[in-house]
A protein has these predicted regions:
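Oxyanion-binding and handling regions
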Residues: 1-49, 78-110
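DPxDG-like acidic metal-binding loop motif
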Residues: 53-58, 63-82
């Protein structure tokens, strides 16, 4: 089963083979992404081990959403020992997010 994931916007998009699912996970992405994926696998009579490859929409987009999504797909691909592809179809060893602007991180206090 091919898995596609896009966490670049507040609405998460998950593809499983030819089916597409959307969920407004937004600020709850980190807490609920694994369960969202697992629930959809179960709906399709599948399990984690049935995933044969992963494609990830690596950006541009939300800093936090891309960071969380990239961490999840990188971990899944590594654990399941399956191929990982960026949104352009390139097989990659690791997803590196493409942010739409520099991260707004405050300077450290002196």
């Amino acid at each position: 089963m091919k898995l596609y994931l896009d966490t670049s916007t507040p609405e998460t998009v998950l593809g499983l083979d030819d089916k597409e699912y959307r969920s407004p996970l937004g600020r709850d992405l980190a807490e609920n992404l694994h369960q969202f994926i697992y629930d959809k696998l179960i709906e399709n009579n599948a399990d984690w081990k049935d995933i044969s490859e992963i494609t990830f929409m690596s950006g541009p987009g939300s800093f936090t959403g891309l960071r969380i999504g990239a961490a999840v797909v990188n971990a899944l691909a590594s654990e399941l020992n399956i191929p990982l592809y960026d949104h352009q179809g390139n097989k990659v060893p690791l997803i590196l997010p493409l942010y739409d602007r520099p991260a707004n991180i405050s300077k450290p206090r002196k």
